[in-house]
């Protein structure tokens, strides 16, 4: 079982066979462009109407944007990164106490994405945590490093508030009431994936994570500021998203694409590797309550002309999440299964 993890400290000189992608499904890193006009939004702006306009343009055009002056203290962010690095540098024996291939487990260390279903693995280890309500899950979290529970608890609370603030702005940017998303999504769950991508001997042959969309409502990503690895697909072209100091990367998940009736996009994105440096990222996912019914917001289609109809049929988040995990990560957009005929 221990051989499944790649965060061992061992430096491979060639890529093991089970990570090598077919020629037609390789990242073609030389064809990736730099995204020069990637939105950077200052959440401390006092001009709310301008802020809402920026959010609308970013969500409709890119499905991604970065935010600065978001309210999370730099010390909390630095501590989160530090304790995550410390976790992955622990001994295999210590880490394997948390290892599981079962995606239903609320706290688990695993590798790739869904190893039970994959034919080719991804160059990634990750620690998956449920973070809300914290008191329900914190005792499952790693006891080592000793500061892990305290730091992650603090970070999770802060990031949750950032997410709520952004969801309000997104609601308003669609012309909806400020609290529309909050009401529809219900008591939102919160998950975290602490991703670790070791140096890879042949980055052009594999992925850290292949192209995928996020099944949740909103993702708040803390990127490693020293290594670029996130790429997004726009108009058929892959673009690298360079990390910005002290910024979070925000992306629209599948549920907000459905709620916006397709106005906002849950965009394909991927993580690539490099030969020199390990890369760390911390993704926080805000998720609708399992029983929350997802359907295109009526004000977005009822008042329009007769040809404007809901793009997606109604479904619960529990139904969607089950479908998402029953498939390979890089299959068709999971929302395709919920289109209105």
From Swiss-Prot:
Chain sites annotated for binding Fe cation: 212, 214, 269
MF terms (GO), sorted A to Z: flavone synthase activity; metal ion binding; salicylate 5-hydroxylase activity
Cofactor: binding details: Binds 1 Fe(2+) ion per subunit.
Disruption phenotype: In the double mutant eds1-2 dmr6-1 and in dmr6-2, reduced susceptibility to the downy mildew pathogen Hyaloperonospora arabidopsidis. Reduced hyphal growth due to immature haustoria, often with aberrant shapes. Reduced susceptibility to Pseudomonas syringae pv. tomato DC3000 and the oomycete Phytophthora capsici, associated with enhanced defense gene expression and elevated salicylic acid levels. Normal susceptibility to P. syringae pv. tomato and Golovinomyces orontii. Enhanced expression of a subset of defense-associated genes.
Domain Fe2OG dioxygenase: 188-288
Keyword Oxidoreductase: yes
Inducing or repressing factors: Locally induced during infections with both compatible and incompatible Hyaloperonospora arabidopsidis isolates, specifically in cells containing haustoria or directly surrounding the intercellular hyphae. Induced by the salicylic acid analog BTH. Accumulates in constitutive defense mutants (e.g. sid2 and npr1 mutants). Accumulates upon infection with the downy mildew Hyaloperonospora arabidopsidis, the powdery mildew Erysiphe orontii, and the bacterium Pseudomonas syringae as well as salicylic acid (SA) treatment.
Keyword NAD: yes
Top-rank lineage group of the source organism: Eukaryota
Residues where 2-oxoglutarate binds: 279
Xref: Gene3D superfamilies: B-lactam Antibiotic, Isopenicillin N Synthase, Chain (2.60.120.330)
Protein keywords: Dioxygenase, Iron, Metal-binding, NAD, Oxidoreductase, Plant defense
Cysteine disulfide partners in this protein: none
One Pfam family per UniProt: DIOX_N
Catalytic reaction(s) noted: salicylate + NADH + O2 + H(+) = 2,3-dihydroxybenzoate + NAD(+) + H2O
Enzyme class: oxidoreductase
EC number: 1.14.11.-, 1.14.13.-
Any one of the GO BP annotations: cellular response to hypoxia
Cofactor: Fe(2+)
Family statement: Belongs to the iron/ascorbate-dependent oxidoreductase family.
Role played: Converts salicylic acid (SA) to 2,3-dihydroxybenzoic acid (2,3-DHBA). Suppressor of immunity. Regulates negatively defense associated genes expression (e.g. PR-1, PR-2, and PR-5). Negative regulator of defense against Hyaloperonospora arabidopsidis.
Identification of the protein by name: Protein DOWNY MILDEW RESISTANCE 6
Gene: DMR6
């Amino acid at each position: 079982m221990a051989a499944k993890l790649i965060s061992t400290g061992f430096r491979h000189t060639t890529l093991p066979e089970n990570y090598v992608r077919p020629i037609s499904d390789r990242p073609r890193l030389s064809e990736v462009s730099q995204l020069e006009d990637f939105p950077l939004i200052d959440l401390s702006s006092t001009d709310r109407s301008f802020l809402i306009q920026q959010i609308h343009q970013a969500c409709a055009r890119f499905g991604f944007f970065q935010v600065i002056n978001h309210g999370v203290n730099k010390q909390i962010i630095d501590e989160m990164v530090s304790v995550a690095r410390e976790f992955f540098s622990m001994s295999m024996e210590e880490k394997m106490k948390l290892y599981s291939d079962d995606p239903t487990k609320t706290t688990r260390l695993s590798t790739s994405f869904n190893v039970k279903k994959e034919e080719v693995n991804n160059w990634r280890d990750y620690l998956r945590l449920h973070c809300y309500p914290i008191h329900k899950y914190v005792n499952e979290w790693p006891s080592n490093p000793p500061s892990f529970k305290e730091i992650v608890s603090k970070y999770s609370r802060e990031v949750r508030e950032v997410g709520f603030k952004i969801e309000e702005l997104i609601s308003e940017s669609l012309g909806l009431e400020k609290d529309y998303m909050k009401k529809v999504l219900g008591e939102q769950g919160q998950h975290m994936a602490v991703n670790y991508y070791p140096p890879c001997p042949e980055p052009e042959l594999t992925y850290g994570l292949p192209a995928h969309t996020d099944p949740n409502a909103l993702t708040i990503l803390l990127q490693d500021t020293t290594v670029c690895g996130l790429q997004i697909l726009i108009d058929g072209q892959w673009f690298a998203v360079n990390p910005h100091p002290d910024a979070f990367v925000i992306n629209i998940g599948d549920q907000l694409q459905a709620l916006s009736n397709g106005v906002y996009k849950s965009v394909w994105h991927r993580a690539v590797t490099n030969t020199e440096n390990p890369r760390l990222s911390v993704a926080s996912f805000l998720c609708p309550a399992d029983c929350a019914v997802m359907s295109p917001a009526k004000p977005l289609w009822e008042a329009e002309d007769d040809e404007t109809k809901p793009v997606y049929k109604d479904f619960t988040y529990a139904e969607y999440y089950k479908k998402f995990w029953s498939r390979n990560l890089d299959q068709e957009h999971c929302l395709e299964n919920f289109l209105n005929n």
